[in-house]
Amino acid sequence: MAGMQLDEIIEYLRYSKHIPEETIYELCLKCQELLVNESNVTHVDTPVTICGDIHGQLHDLLTLFEKSEGIEKNRFIFLGDFVDRGFYSLESFLLLLCYKLRYPDRITLIRGNHETRQITKVYGFYDEVIRKYGNSNVWRYCCEVFDYLSLGAIINGQIFCVHGGLSPDVMTVDEIRSIDRKQEVPHEGAMCDLLWSDPDEVDTWSLSPRGAGFLFGKNEVDQFLHRNDISLIARAHQLVMEGYKEMFDGGLVTVWSAPNYCYRCGNVAAVLRIDDDLSRNYTIFEAVPAQDNRGNAIIPTKKPQMDYFL
């Protein structure tokens, strides 16, 4: 790709080194060609590690892989929100794309509510690209990849993975497969809800305070599990100070993988490994220090923009 080999690009990204614009264009194009053949809901076998929001925290993403013994030996599902708020959204997303090309059967990338043109223009990713490249071309290339990301995954036919949650317009996983995903995320409807909805202690569907998606409760989760003959919904989308949170008698779990979110929240992060017997094993990890052993800044001192809600 523009004179750079894939493994060389990976090494550059791990150290947040500059990648030529032409190389990023070719990388994004190759990823689209790969992702277009994937279903809206990707089938994944165990063992697999489920990862929540990353939000541009590159160094913590590298820690995540280290704690999980690396992508060379394991499968991973990332539940979206790769970009915005952190300082290294571009490097984080491109690194995951490189891994997708390098190990296509070992990594599944699901779209989050931040993988849209509208959201990234407001919450950091667009401005980051302008700052690093002086124009919006790289942002546009990445946004085109967003449109090809899957909306969910099914692990061993038993665990449904999604970024946000459920939708009153979708009763079965098969209905999700019929959605036209190759578009900007709509402001309402099933595709929007899957990326924006949240679980809560409510009796029935309620409008979300986020302004998009719905709140759903135990009844909706139990019905979805029963109707689809599955045992668990794994999702991300909400900060959890302890890294993960199980709800509704273990029928739903929120996984959060961005420690010390926005470099100030003080939370730990988690990933969830699902073994062949469908047992759940959580790994908790903390954020990388702000400085290395020599006192050099790893994380810039300027804080990213804080916005609509954590």
Swiss-Prot record:
Q: What class of enzyme is it?
A: hydrolase
User: Which cofactors?
Assistant: Mn(2+)
What GO terms are given for molecular function?
A: metal ion binding; protein serine/threonine phosphatase activity
Q: Which family does the record claim for this protein?
A: Belongs to the PPP phosphatase family. PP-4 (PP-X) subfamily.
Presence of keyword Manganese: yes
Q: Which organism is it from?
A: Eremothecium gossypii (strain ATCC 10895 / CBS 109.51 / FGSC 9923 / NRRL Y-1056) (Yeast)
> Where does the record place the modification Leucine methyl ester?
L310
The molecule here is called Serine/threonine-protein phosphatase 4 catalytic subunit
The active site of this protein is located at H114
EC numbers listed for it are 3.1.3.16
Q: Which gene encodes it?
A: PPH3
Reaction catalysed?
O-phospho-L-seryl-[protein] + H2O = L-seryl-[protein] + phosphate; O-phospho-L-threonyl-[protein] + H2O = L-threonyl-[protein] + phosphate
Where, in this chain's numbering, is Mn(2+) 2 bound? D81, N113, H163, H237
**Which Cys-Cys disulphide bridges does the record give?**
none
**What is the protein's quaternary organization?**
Catalytic subunit of the histone H2A phosphatase complex (HTP-C) containing PPH3, PSY2 and PSY4.
